[in-house]
Each structure stands twice: as C-alpha cells, then as structure tokens.
Amino acid sequence: MSKTIKVILLTSSEKVIGEIVEVGSEIGEPDCKLIKPYEVQNLAPWMEDHTDQNEFMISSDKIITMADPKSDLLKNYLEKIN
C-alpha cells in the first residue's frame, strides 16, 4: 500500500508535511491520522518540544487544504524520516 504524503495547511496556519490517513470515527471525533508530521518551514518533527509521539489524530475540520508536496520538499522529508 502506498503512503499518501501531503502538505497540509491547518486552521492554526501551521503547515505540515506527512502521511495522512482517513479513519472511521463517530461524529465529533478525530477522523484523520497524521503519521510522522514535520513542520514545513524547518523540517522538524511537528510538536517535538511537547511529545515523543509521531502519530496524531486530528479532526478534518482543522484542515484548510492539502496538496502534493514539491519534489524537493518530498525528497528532503523522506530523507528525514528514513
């Protein structure tokens, strides 16, 4: 199964890159899983100052938009996580 790596703009104005998976959930519960999200600006793990987790549940209503990353950003991200 191929991973879906996207650049994600959150309602908080944060831009992250990572794998995103849609998951089934009850109404009002988080319905997306972000796997190994990194801040786009400095390619550092998202929320690294606050947690050691690398998977996060997030509600889709916190996502403004998603896009395919530029090839150089994707390459740099994949080098960081592997």
Give the role of each language-model region.
Residues S2-N82:
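Conserved RNA-binding domains used in RNP assembly and mRNA/RNA metabolism
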